[in-house]
Amino acid sequence: MKRLNVFLILGILISYGCSEGLDENSVRTTAQGEVIGFKEGETYAWRGIPFAQPPISELRWKAPRPPDPFESRFEAKEFAQACFQPQGFMTGEEGGWTGSEDCLYLNIWSPAWSPQELGEKKVPVMMWIHGGGNVIGSADTYSPSHMVSDHEVIVVTVQYRMSNLGWFRHPALRQESSTLEDASGSFGTLDNIMALRWIRENISQFGGDINNVTIYGESAGGHNVAALYASPLASDLFH
């Protein structure tokens, strides 16, 4: 019986490792360099791709900057940490904080096309903005893999700075700002715009149609969709 249990555990671990293993057929070339993902059900998934430089140190309370190039092939297999937020809302425990300021990452799901099929694809793209009152939340809340495989679309989920790190205006910050975007205080909105710019530049490499991009969200994510509708900076980035 013990030997049987050992084999069962090994089988589960091997199965899990295969399902989460990197897949050479998922290699895509972005402006930053190559990324490789993995098979998730009937889809390919890429987790934790940076779409901006980390908004830390001198980039805190600044508009997002374009991401740096990869030094080598990027293994997109792990979700990034959530953006900095109160811990109690997520865990039910009082006090404390969780997440990271280095959080401007996105995740992509596409149908599991073969390399031959990929070259012929140009499918709708949907960018999901999570909810949480612009105080809590993260891009890994839901998996859209079934929607992607059933309807042949590409879904991108994004993270953005929240609370006072995402929306904060102060005279001292305006004095230090060299651009209108830096002085705006609307850093969370600008993060979502930067994600849309990344999609515009790269999603065709995943089989997406840059002229058929939909934005949608839940709760505060819906509010942020409305903000993107109102921003001239985002006017040509979705449809």
Positions of predicted regions on the chain:
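Alpha/beta-hydrolase fold nucleophile elbow
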Residues: F206-E218
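Short glycine-enriched nucleophile-adjacent loop
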Residues: G222-A234
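Non-catalytic accessory segments of hydrolases
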Residues: G17-T189, I210
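Bacterial N-terminal signal peptides
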Residues: F7-S15
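Aromatic/hydrophobic pocket-lining residues that form the small-molecule binding cavity
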Residues: N192
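A conserved short beta-strand
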Residues: S235-H239
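Positively charged n-region of N-terminal signal peptides that target proteins for export
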Residues: M1-L4
